[in-house]
C-alpha cells in the first residue's frame, strides 16, 4: 500500500512540477492569459507570481515522505479550485484562452475538467493508501 501511495504522490508531484515550470518559462504568456479573464484580471499580477510558487511548494510537500498526505490534500484543493474556476469560465466566458503546455494544450476545457477530476480522485486515492498503510502499521497483530 505504501508503494502505491508513493507512486500516486510521484504522479501528482510531476504534474505540479510540469505546470509550475511551464508557468515560470513563459510567465508573460501566463499573466496575459490571466489578464484575459475578467474574473482574475484584478489579481492577475499576484496570481502570476504566487501560483507557480505554490505549485512548487506542493511538489516539495509531495516529495518529502512525512508531508505527502498534506501535499495530496493541498493538491486536491488547488485542482478543485481551478476546476470550479474552469466551470465558471465555460458557462460565462466560453472563449477563454489557454496557456497550457505539452499534451494538455490539446484538451478542450471540458476535457480539462475531466483531467482535473481524475487528478483530484488520484489525490484522494493516495490519501486513502497512506492512511490505510499508517492504520495498518498501528494495528496490533
Where are these regions (language model features)?
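Membrane-interfacial helix-loop segments of redox and metal-homeostasis proteins
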Residues: 1-141
Amino acid at each position: 500500500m505504501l508503494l502505491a501511495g508513493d507512486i500516486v504522490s510521484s504522479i501528482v508531484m510531476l504534474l505540479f512540477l510540469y505546470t509550475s515550470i511551464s508557468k515560470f518559462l513563459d510567465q508573460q504568456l501566463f499573466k496575459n492569459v490571466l489578464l484575459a479573464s475578467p474574473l482574475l484580471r484584478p489579481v492577475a499580477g499576484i496570481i502570476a507570481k504566487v501560483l507557480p510558487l505554490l505549485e512548487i511548494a506542493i511538489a516539495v510537500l509531495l516529495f518529502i515522505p512525512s508531508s505527502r498526505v498534506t501535499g495530496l490534500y493541498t493538491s486536491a484543493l488547488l485542482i478543485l479550485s481551478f476546476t470550479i474556476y474552469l466551470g465558471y469560465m465555460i458557462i460565462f466566458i466560453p472563449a477563454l484562452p489557454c496557456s497550457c503546455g505539452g499534451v494538455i494544450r490539446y484538451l478542450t476545457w471540458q476535457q480539462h475538467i475531466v483531467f482535473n477530476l481524475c487528478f483530484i480522485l488520484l489525490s484522494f486515492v493516495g490519501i486513502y493508501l497512506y492512511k490505510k498503510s499508517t492504520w495498518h502499521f498501528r494495528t496490533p497483530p
